[in-house]
Amino acid sequence: MKRPKLKKASKRLSCAKRYKIQKKVREHNRKLKKAAKKQGISRKAKKDIGVPNSAPFKEEVLREAEQRKQELETLKEQNKIVKQQEKAAKRKKEKDAASSVKEPAAKKAKKAAKIKEARAAIVKVKSAKTFKCQELNKVIEASDVIVEVLDARDPLGCRCPQLEEMVLKHEGKKKLLFILNKIDLVPKDNLEKWLHFLEAECPTFLFKSSMQLKDRTVQQKRQQRGTNAVLDHSRAASCFGKDFLLQTLNDLANKKEGETMLKVGVVGFPNVGKSSIINSLKEMRACNAGVQRGLTRCMQEVHITKKVKMIDSPGILAALSNPGSAMALRSLQVEEKEESPQEAVRNLLKQCNQQHVMLQYNVPDYRSSLEFLTTFAMKHGLLQKGGVADTELAATTFLNDWTGAKLSYYSRVPERQGLPSYLSDAIVTELQSDVDMDAVKKGNENVKRSVRFPNLASCISFDSSGPTAGVLDVSELPKEILTKAATTTDAEEEKMDTTTNTDEPEAESHISSTVEPIQEPTEKRKDKPAKEVKFVPVNTDLTSMQNKNNEDAYDFNTDFV
């Protein structure tokens, strides 16, 4: 009986009814067991009694049983693998049958993509160097004053005789200046010797670029000045040599005839600090600068003052005739994948004092560059899978230290053996007459007093290989690259022509093949046959089934409804 205001009926029964149900269930189960016993069906699994201890060959019997068990397991595993292979072969067969129509178009598209990538890579290698040469020549032509930036750690190796000769022999009588950058990475005595050596040939300015500049737009700078906000003096606090360099450039601009601005071209090898000097003078990040070499790829004009405009230039291309150590520091062969980092480190370590390198990097004695890189990688945690030292990454990190603005090393000043062939006493006096040398020397002294120099014992001694030859004309580029690029492009074009002529009917399929990778998943779903749903009739009448199997089965519906 259903109770009022309740959804479920009560489960309470009288004791007579409950006992009667239990009795009928017991009788029913007893009859089922009796029938199963007649048919020989037993629900309980027979217990393995094992091998008795009194058996004479117990160990052999157990061993044979274990062997049979393993054989059954291996057989089961083999059957499983065979089934998986059959399923995989069946799927592959269906996939091949479905994609057999599209295979010619897909092959042609893949081949065309490979040819396009190869051609783009060749054009990139060919055009990058020629473009840099053209941009460097544009900077020299457009500039009134050429500033050659030299790394104070190796000033002689940063000099390019071809560039200096081109500037001094130019028809426009351009002025040449030297800037010794990164002076905080060399000992003071070594810096003074280099300054004395360079001042005998050209006016030289000491400079330390700022490393704390942030990206700030002109609008933000105007708002800061207009609101009289507190200036962030720490942004250019680490820059030294800016004031007297700007004063010299302003004096040269005042001496210039006409009202045009003085254009100052900043040139030098990669990663000597050209863009950093311009950013320090501008007091904001106007040019892209960083540890990576070759970031500047085209000329860029930056207005410093109302009278001075500086032009940033890409790095000078180093000629292949230079020694290996010079190419490791002054060229972009490692970045352009023309030389391995390990080979560059090997050439570089030959020119270094081994004891100084061991003290600087805190590594034990090494017999080869590979041993040094392995120890260096282990010490800095540069490991591959399995704990193997990643020597390539270690070599790249080592090169970044040498070309960046952190590692302190110095090169010895050579004995003077006269002026270079493109310089004379008259040219030197003319270069020095354009600049107030007393003010320059005074400014250099102030910079030396302000900068904190490293100790000689904490620096690495480096043997410079002398001036680095540069490539300034496109015709002076290695002909192997240009001829190789030309032949490969011609060969690829001929290959493309032959493929297009032989497969003319497939022109439309080539166009559609570019879209095929996007449509491929949907096509796979279409090709896959849909599973047929089979409806099996099932008799849901429990009473009829039970009566059919056993007429004496208990029925709750008939007795208790």
Curated annotation (Swiss-Prot):
<dbReference type="InterPro" id="IPR050755">
    <property type="entry name" value="TRAFAC_YlqF/YawG_RiboMat"/>
</dbReference>
<feature type="compositionally biased region" description="Basic residues">
    <location>
        <begin position="28"/>
        <end position="46"/>
    </location>
</feature>
<feature type="region of interest" description="Disordered">
    <location>
        <begin position="76"/>
        <end position="110"/>
    </location>
</feature>
<feature type="binding site">
    <location>
        <begin position="268"/>
        <end position="275"/>
    </location>
    <ligand>
        <name>GTP</name>
    </ligand>
</feature>
<dbReference type="GO" id="GO:0005634">
    <property type="term" value="C:nucleus"/>
</dbReference>
<feature type="region of interest" description="Disordered">
    <location>
        <begin position="28"/>
        <end position="58"/>
    </location>
</feature>
<dbReference type="GO" id="GO:0042127">
    <property type="term" value="P:regulation of cell population proliferation"/>
</dbReference>
<dbReference type="InterPro" id="IPR027417">
    <property type="entry name" value="P-loop_NTPase"/>
</dbReference>
<keyword id="KW-0547">Nucleotide-binding</keyword>
<dbReference type="GO" id="GO:0007096">
    <property type="term" value="P:regulation of exit from mitosis"/>
</dbReference>
<dbReference type="Pfam" id="PF01926">
    <property type="entry name" value="MMR_HSR1"/>
</dbReference>
<dbReference type="Pfam" id="PF08701">
    <property type="entry name" value="GN3L_Grn1"/>
</dbReference>
<dbReference type="GO" id="GO:0005525">
    <property type="term" value="F:GTP binding"/>
</dbReference>
<feature type="region of interest" description="Disordered">
    <location>
        <begin position="486"/>
        <end position="532"/>
    </location>
</feature>
<feature type="binding site">
    <location>
        <begin position="312"/>
        <end position="315"/>
    </location>
    <ligand>
        <name>GTP</name>
    </ligand>
</feature>
<dbReference type="GO" id="GO:0003407">
    <property type="term" value="P:neural retina development"/>
</dbReference>
<dbReference type="GO" id="GO:0045664">
    <property type="term" value="P:regulation of neuron differentiation"/>
</dbReference>
<dbReference type="GO" id="GO:0005730">
    <property type="term" value="C:nucleolus"/>
</dbReference>
<comment type="function">
    <text>May play a role in regulating cellular proliferation.</text>
</comment>
<dbReference type="GO" id="GO:0000467">
    <property type="term" value="P:exonucleolytic trimming to generate mature 3'-end of 5.8S rRNA from tricistronic rRNA transcript (SSU-rRNA, 5.8S rRNA, LSU-rRNA)"/>
</dbReference>
<dbReference type="InterPro" id="IPR014813">
    <property type="entry name" value="Gnl3_N_dom"/>
</dbReference>
<comment type="similarity">
    <text>Belongs to the TRAFAC class YlqF/YawG GTPase family.</text>
</comment>
<dbReference type="InterPro" id="IPR006073">
    <property type="entry name" value="GTP-bd"/>
</dbReference>
<feature type="domain" description="CP-type G">
    <location>
        <begin position="133"/>
        <end position="319"/>
    </location>
</feature>
<feature type="compositionally biased region" description="Basic and acidic residues">
    <location>
        <begin position="76"/>
        <end position="88"/>
    </location>
</feature>
<feature type="coiled-coil region">
    <location>
        <begin position="53"/>
        <end position="98"/>
    </location>
</feature>
<keyword id="KW-0175">Coiled coil</keyword>
<protein>
    <recommendedName>
        <fullName>Guanine nucleotide-binding protein-like 3</fullName>
    </recommendedName>
</protein>
<feature type="binding site">
    <location>
        <begin position="181"/>
        <end position="184"/>
    </location>
    <ligand>
        <name>GTP</name>
    </ligand>
</feature>
<keyword id="KW-0342">GTP-binding</keyword>
<dbReference type="InterPro" id="IPR023179">
    <property type="entry name" value="GTP-bd_ortho_bundle_sf"/>
</dbReference>
<dbReference type="InterPro" id="IPR030378">
    <property type="entry name" value="G_CP_dom"/>
</dbReference>
<feature type="compositionally biased region" description="Basic and acidic residues">
    <location>
        <begin position="521"/>
        <end position="532"/>
    </location>
</feature>
<keyword id="KW-0539">Nucleus</keyword>
